[in-house]
Every structure is written in C-alpha cells, then in structure tokens.
Amino acid sequence: MPHGGRLAAVAAVLRVPPVSVAPPAGPSVAPPFELLFIKRAEVPHDPWSGHMAFPGGRHEPGDASLAETALRETREELGLDLRDGTLLGALDDLAPVSAHLPRIVVRPFVVVMTSSPPLVPSHEVAATFWEPVARLRSSVAQATHIVRLGGREAHYPAYRVGPHLVWGMTERILRQLLTLFDPHETAPTTPVPLPVESLP
C-alpha cells in the first residue's frame, strides 16, 4: 500500500438482481450482475459532498483491517452486512490525483451478495442505485464531467448512473472493476479471481 496518507476502504457490492427486476435468462445463462452506488448527502466542507460513490469510509483505530473498515462503514451507511455475501478480494489501492483533496489511500473490496436485503440508508446517504454491469460496460454509460474552477475547465471521464455522473476516484475504481469481467461475454456474469482478504 502507498504511504503518506490516511487509510480508507470502500465496498464495490455486486448482486444478481431479484427475479422481479431481472431480465429473462435461458437455462444456461445467469442473470447479469448489478453494482451498488450511493449518492452522498450534501455536507458543508466535505470535498466529496453530494458525490456518487461506493459505500465506505476512513479506517478507524478499532478496525482490525481495511476489510473490517469496509464492513463497518457499509453497515453504518446502509444497514447492509457484507458478511452475508462473498468477498472476492481487493482491487488496487488508489489515492486522489488532485493536490486540493485530502491525502488518503483507498482500498476497494469487491463483494457479491447472495441475497438482496433492503437497504436502510443513514443520514450520510442521500440515495442508492443498483446499476446493471452490462450497461456500465456499454457506450451509453460513457460521459464527461466538466469542472470549472478559476475561469478554467477540467474534463474528467465519467459514467452515467441514473441522473448522476460517477467521476473522480469512484470512476477510477469502477474502471478497474469492469476490467475483471470477461470482455467476450455479452452479459458479464463471472469476474476473475482477486487477491483474497477475509472479512472478520
């Protein structure tokens, strides 16, 4: 893990959609995965206020590992217990590229839920979205986010999720996650194995 910043963890949570919303599948075709996103609540002085994100947060002294950080934060933010799912492993650690953002190192964990319990968002979460992975991999999801600061424009790659754009560090995590799926599958259902770090 890179050094020089505080540590944090997020959970990229996948599920097979419930039968009521899953597209029809043949006898040998599994329904495609959906990926969970949250829209963070508007909080003054929070650099990620109102952003689209994965559930997660900063590592606390009582957390035995970053996997436990992801578990605790997801439970606090959404009432979702990741121990009810299967941890595939961790993606590469990431840090913000902007010098204006806090120095923090984020480890993303990939979890597949074997059921779809209802989400109970806390005050930190304004909205939740389950987005089909197949759509995220299609051209219709590709977008550009424009940031205007001091009379200048910066253009960032982004993904459309509902009426919102996923950009910044979450976009970088998502791009890394999507590379795990077999590019030849028309409906991505089987991500490749990841380095495993067990949940507590």
Question: What spans do the regions from the language model cover?
Answer:
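N-terminal leader/linker segments that precede catalytic domains of diphosphate-processing enzymes
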Residues: M1-F54, R58-P117, A134, V147-P200
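Short, charged, solvent-exposed linker or helix-capping segments at domain edges/interfaces
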Residues: P24, L119-H123, V140
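Acidic, glycine-rich loop-and-strand cores that form catalytic or ligand-binding grooves
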Residues: P118-R135
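A mid-sequence, solvent-exposed acidic-amphipathic segment
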Residues: R135-T144
